[in-house]
Regions:
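Anionic coordination/interaction segments
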Residues: 1-342
């Protein structure tokens, strides 16, 4: 079966999310994160890992990328956001994903609740592969595309900046930021990683990365590698301590801008809990206005939502019988009478 898909957009910044938590982020005509059409494995997107430091057990806030069976799991799609509810080993996670209508950013808010009767110490680790290039160019030669991406860690803001160096004088520069903010709770120092090899490790995948294995040396911090790396990623880790019944909210924010100054301005803005809160309200208002502008009902929106999976992923079940296809002798203009541009 094809993945269920939800699309979130403000017209410039676009996010696709599947029911398992995979997907992509795009800005204008650029791929922000790496993605390949793979309806079976679906291992691409922006992810968040949770690890119990006392036991070494880890899982993700959605089914992807760890593929571990949760005690309870629910994916909820609405016009303005995507939600995931999950329970693992008496730890509840509730994730909301939305795109801001006023800035080119996506907000992933995760509320983590300790439902056990003991104090828990957890690692929260974000992860995404950064591209900032045309999707076709990255798909043809990803290793070459990676050579132009440079990363910079900003410890004072708990953020990572990435930029794509221009290949010629006429090429514009693009900037990306990746931020993790803990709301109302001090977790100590954050750690960072921008080298995929050091995060995943040799012979591993995103379901069992090297970075999620407890260190025998006792240090669980990421390496802090930055600069011109061969395979750029963005990953931030924070440690949280939760008493029984206690909750903490983690905001993971990513976005794009044309200059470094604008990017730092967005980082500063979305570290503020009140400004981040506005994203969900604005996204809901934007989705309602969009439906009204195109004269669509909620029933129409639900129909489009069911069809979008077959647009993003090739659906062989919709292909007609080969004998009928062979009989067709019309060109693209034959579609115009059905209001299809082709």
């Amino acid at each position: 079966p094809l993945p269920e898909v939800q699309l979130l957009s403000n017209g410039r910044y676009h996010v696709m999310v599947t029911q398992a938590g995979g997907g992509y982020s795009r800005w204008k005509d650029l791929a922000v994160t790496r993605w390949r059409e793979d309806a079976t494995r679906d291992p691409w997107g922006m992810f968040c890992y949770i690890r119990d430091i006392s036991t070494g057990e880890y899982w993700s806030t959605a089914y992807q990328p760890t593929l571990k069976q949760p005690d309870r799991y629910e994916a909820i799609f609405s016009d303005s956001k995507v939600e995931f509810r999950r329970r693992d080993d008496d730890i509840n996670t509730y994730t909301q994903i939305a795109v801001s209508p006023e800035d080119d950013i996506e907000l992933r808010r995760i509320r983590i609740t300790n439902r056990s009767r003991k104090r828990r110490e957890l690692d929260v680790t974000s992860y995404a592969e950064i591209v900032m290039a045309q999707p076709a160019a990255d798909e043809i030669h990803p290793a070459f595309s990676n050579l132009f991406v440079q990363t910079e860690i900003i410890p004072d803001h708990q953020a990572i900046l990435s930029t794509r160096r221009p290949r010629s004088e006429n090429d514009p520069a693009y900037w990306n930021f990746h931020l993790m903010a803990l709301q109302g709770k001090d977790s100590g120092e954050a750690s960072y990683e921008t080298d995929r090899l050091k995060f995943v490790g040799r012979g591993n995948t995103l379901s069992n990365p090297q970075a999620m294995k407890l260190s025998v040396e006792g240090s669980n911090a990421l390496s802090g590698t930055e600069g011109s790396v061969l395979d750029p990623v963005v990953s931030i880790r924070r440690t949280i301590r939760l008493a029984p019944g206690e909750s903490v909210t983690v905001d993971i924010v990513s976005g794009m801008a044309e200059t470094r100054a604008k990017t730092l301005g967005l980082v500063e803005k979305y570290r503020d809990r009140r400004l981040a809160d506005r994203v969900f309200n604005l996204a809901w208002t934007h989705s309602e206005l969009t439906l009204r502008q195109i004269n669509a009902t909620q029933a129409d929106a639900q129909l489009y939502g069911r069809l979008v999976g077959s647009v993003v992923y090739a659906n062989a079940s919709l292909r007609t019988d080969p004998k009928i296809i062979v009989k067709n002798h019309r060109g693209q203009s034959g579609l115009w009478g059905y209001a299809i541009s082709g």
